[in-house]
Amino acid sequence: MYDLSSKFNSFYTTHVVLPQSEQDNLHTKKNLNIQRLKDGLKEYNAENNTSYSIVETCVQGSVAMSTVVQNEDEDYDIDVAVVFDKSVLGDKGAQATRNLVANALKRKTKQFNTEPEVKTSCVRIKYADGYHIDFAVYRRHYDSTNECWIYEHAGSEWSERELRGLTDWFKLQNDDSDGDLRKIIRLSKMFCKSRTTWKNMPSGLLQTVLCNEKLQSTYERTDEQFYYTMQEIVNRLETSTSVAAPVDDGRDLTQRNIDHQRMTNWKNRLESKLEDLEVLFREDCTKDDAIQAWYGFFNHDYWGDQIIASESYSVNSVTKSVCRFFDGEQFIEELYPMQLLYHCDVSVSYTHLRAHET
């Protein structure tokens, strides 16, 4: 495979990894809206003579795993779990508890363009600049026998689920791969977001599980590891588009038809674009060929700029060569081989003058 690792690594560092300043911004928004929720609950309690409160919060998803990637549309997803005590909620159902969270948020987000949206698995608030925060709602009770907290997620109904299980699992897998897993997941997400026309692509969680399942850790170069991991994912999805969670007793992450359609879309689009990378394995592959191939795969301006820079370098090289050719005084013998032959006619006349004596 053509070694373009220097530029590939530069692409990853400068255009894939989310800058620390942006990561800090996400955490600031997270903290601000948790406080809004708490303040909204206090107001709700004062009006309704209740005592609901958030007893625990936990960042989940890509923010917790540090797999968020740069996004030109700034459509960043922040997942936050908010936990109530089961004893305080009483017999309040999953839907009713999500409605409670939405009510509390609505009181403190009146400046937003859209009201909090109650979804099946969370309550979402959207920022005008593209950010959105998903509040996953939980309740907990203490298991004195096993001396641990039991958490239940408010989905279509209450269901037992680990609060930090996925994040802990990911950190362990990433450490075992010396950080390579996080790199491959980020690159996979960049591919899935590479075309605005690509709808219904898999969630970050589904990509995370399959990237871990098929990670080709025998390759040292990131570009090779990414390529062969994606190839293995295509092969895997040819067999099955079902994915099970690595925690929560292997719950099905692809229960809906749309989930399977997203996995199929991923497979088809990956397969098509991987074919365009076959030029990287040709013996006559040039640097320009490799740049063009990765540009076609990621559809990112970074690679387009590399093509322009390469073409500009070629033109400048020719110009400099021409300039050097005419730089300074030029002699004909520097251009053509020469053999000089001389023919001379010499005529000598001699006159002897005798001096006169005096």
Annotate each predicted stretch with a short phrase.
Residues 346-349:
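A structural signal for beta-rich interaction modules in eukaryotic proteins
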Residues 1-75, 87-96:
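N-terminal regions immediately upstream of nucleotidyltransferase
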Residues 69, 131-184:
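Extended, alpha-helix-rich binding/interface surfaces that flank or overlap catalytic cores
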Residues 180-293:
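Conserved nucleotidyltransferase catalytic core and NTase-mimicking acidic/glycine-rich helix/loop elements
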Residues 272-322:
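Long, low-complexity C-terminal extensions of enzymes
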Residues 98-144:
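Conserved catalytic core of two-metal-ion nucleotidyltransferases
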Residues 351-358:
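Conserved small/polar residues in nucleotide/adenosyl-binding loops
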Residues 84-90, 216-218:
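A generic structural motif
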